[in-house]
Amino acid sequence: MADGTYRFQQPGAGQFFFQTQQQQPSHQRHLVRNGTNSPTGRLKFSHDTPSPSRSPPLGQAAALNPFTMYSQTHQGQHVLMNGGQAHQRFGMQMPKFQSQSHHPHPAQQAHHHTHHNQASHNINHQHNFSSGALAAATPHFTPSHMQNGAHANVDEDIDESMNEHWQQQLQLAAESRQASSPHYYARAVAQQTKGIQIAPSQPEPQENGGDVKNGLTKVKASPRQGWYALDFGGQGLRALSTSLFSYDFLKELYLNHNKLKALPQTIGQLRKLEHLDLSGNDLTELPEEIGMLTSLKKLYLFDNNIRTLPYEMGYLYRLDTLGIEGNPLNDILKSQIMKEGTRALIKYLREEMPENPPPPDRDWVILDETAGTSTEKITVLSYNALCDSSATQSHFGYTPSRALSWEFRRDVILSELRSHDSDIVCLQEVDQGSYNGYFREQLAYNGYKGVYWPRGRAMGMQEEEAKSVDGCATFFKGTKFILLDKQMINFGQTAVRRPDAKGQDDIYNRLWQKDHIAVVVFLENRLTGSRFIVVNAHLYWDPAFKDVKLIQTAILMEEITKLSETYAKWPACTDKTAFRFSEAEGGEAQTPPEPAPSMEYSSGDQIPLFMCGDFNSSPGSAAYNLIANGRLTEEHPDLEKRLYGNLSRVGMTHPFKLKSAYNSIGELSFTNYTPDFKDILDYIWFTSNTLHVSALLGEVDKDYLQKVPGFPNFHFPSDHIALFAEFVVKGKKGKVVEADFGPQRN
């Protein structure tokens, strides 16, 4: 498993000498700690020990055994005589772990370990056998036997008066202590697969070249990963190579029975790890980065010198089994796991977790040094706030409950909005109750006015019930802008009203049922007369509905096109005076600047357009390409040959020259960050013929992210991050319309 390419010599298919029955000598780490029962002792001889001269029971077929995870094109014969090693040990070379001549099969992937009654440890080794061959395999090593032939039943050492949680600890600790020989788990798997005849595996077809049709590049298929586990057990290791942690695909890692005194911080890179065995080392503490391993289901720390655990282990919300027996653990933590088990201890660490120091502020990235002299600048912020009904412990089990509560998160969101003081703010996932009872009132103190619509489902609900329905809220500075018009686009309802929707089943079965919306506001700058279309959208999330997201985007662009042509003919605004409180007595009244006349635009695509929101589409997706390129043909694979009227028959187009604001720096690393998902979903789009971006809010500090597996947390109140950009309005292509403002001062 971890001894390099030549881990075992491969003898011919000759006579096999089965090991004799022999008691394994006690390991030095079998010392009794903390008053526990002896982990060793003479065990009864098992009559089920397999014989080389007799066929095994049918129930022990390898096809029914969790060790079956191999797909190599050679016979896996490994001679182990009386527990000795019939091979020459070679130095470990990490790059050699992946055998070049093997054809891996993804169906045989890592499975988590079973507990008491089946003390098997299934490891993905670089030697893989196909499932077809394993169906007729005969294992020479059964889960109920240790490698030395001793039976794995240690129930005699367990006090039945103990509760089930601590009984499990003692059971697993005893099993761990008997696994101290070098590469114990790898050899167990080798025994399992002895004598298997392998059918040649079929190579996976690979794409040659790339398809750039419709602006979407098809990435060449990557080879499948055929092994997922490494066994470095019993090697006497005192340190670990940093190259080990570049194998971020690993699901199982065995470092048991070595001489490690510390675990590197880079352990946090193995985020797919499900089983980590560190038993029988000299560890005194764990690094905070252990909390990054949110996929962990089993963490074995038996027989170390650990006295306390880092609070970051509270992030390990999937951890089922924490093996801590044989450590001088402090009484508080030990009582938690003894009385209530692993999950209770992890919850305790999560809920008691102190608030860590906040990260450094995100950098303000200046793209245009000359923008400071521009006559007209505008700032725009977009933020998916994660509504209260979606922020549940089942979805965000790694977040402390007090950091997940809406009362806490809304205050952090409000504080961030006020700190940026953006001219325009677009929020998604804001429920009606929070908009009317909190954000509208609080942001009014900062000079904001708001426009809000909930999602379509709120229409048929009672008033109190509808308060929990989320929607899109757009705020703008009332002293800077005049609201000329506001509209709501319901994608599903708009689709069924199309003349070409008749007989198109997919519109009704897939699109109409989704009640996602976009809010459109038409604004005018009081001083300059420039007009802006601001779109705030939230699209469907499910990756299995790529066609729905694409059609929602197409409908959005189609409706914006219609509205923009209407707005191009919008009459001039005659009353631009902003409301002002009367001056206090004795105060000098400041004369407001003279407002410029309203701008008129020759066509809808000449009006500056901002399109913000959570589009749930990453760069390169069909929805992204439609917005960025202005067209998408009817043959796009994301449509899956579904019927959406003219949109799927003719194709999709729009007249705007849209560009993502963050494309100026190659997009952010992510806009959505959770343990299982990290991608770019949110955008601020702008029309590049009327605007250009001059500055952006940069990345989240990378050092901070090394210890944070996902958002929300105490510093980031949503699983999304805020996007914030500054724009400069280009020279106006429209003509000035003189408006009658009444009598003027001389």
Curated annotation (Swiss-Prot):
It is an enzyme of class 3 (hydrolase). The keyword Hydrolase applies. Its EC number is 3.1.13.4. It catalyses: Exonucleolytic cleavage of poly(A) to 5'-AMP. GO terms for cellular component: CCR4-NOT core complex; Cdc73/Paf1 complex; P-body. PROSITE patterns: LRR (PS51450). Residues 102-118 have a biased composition (Basic residues). Its main location: cytoplasm. LRR repeats lie at residues 249-270, 272-293, 295-316, 318-339. It is found in: Cytoplasm; Nucleus. GO terms for biological process: DNA replication; DNA replication checkpoint signaling; nuclear-transcribed mRNA poly(A) tail shortening; positive regulation of transcription elongation by RNA polymerase II; transcription elongation by RNA polymerase II; traversing start control point of mitotic cell cycle. Pfam families: Exo_endo_phos (PF03372), LRR_14 (PF23598). InterPro entries: CCR4/nocturin_mRNA_transcr, Endo/exonu/phosph_ase_sf, Endo/exonuclease/phosphatase, Leu-rich_rpt, Leu-rich_rpt_typical-subtyp, LRR_dom_sf, LRR_R13L4/SHOC2-like. It comes from the Eukaryota. Keywords: Cytoplasm, Exonuclease, Hydrolase, Leucine-rich repeat, Magnesium, Metal-binding, Nuclease, Nucleus, Repeat, RNA-binding, Transcription, Transcription regulation. Mg(2+) binds at residue 429. Residues 24-61, 96-124 are annotated as: Disordered. One of its GO terms (molecular function) is RNA binding. Acts as a catalytic component of the CCR4-NOT core complex, which in the nucleus seems to be a general transcription factor, and in the cytoplasm the major mRNA deadenylase involved in mRNA turnover. Ccr4 has 3'-5' RNase activity with a strong preference for polyadenylated substrates and also low exonuclease activity towards single-stranded DNA. Belongs to the CCR4/nocturin family. This is CCR4-Not complex 3'-5'-exoribonuclease subunit Ccr4. It comes from Aspergillus oryzae (strain ATCC 42149 / RIB 40).
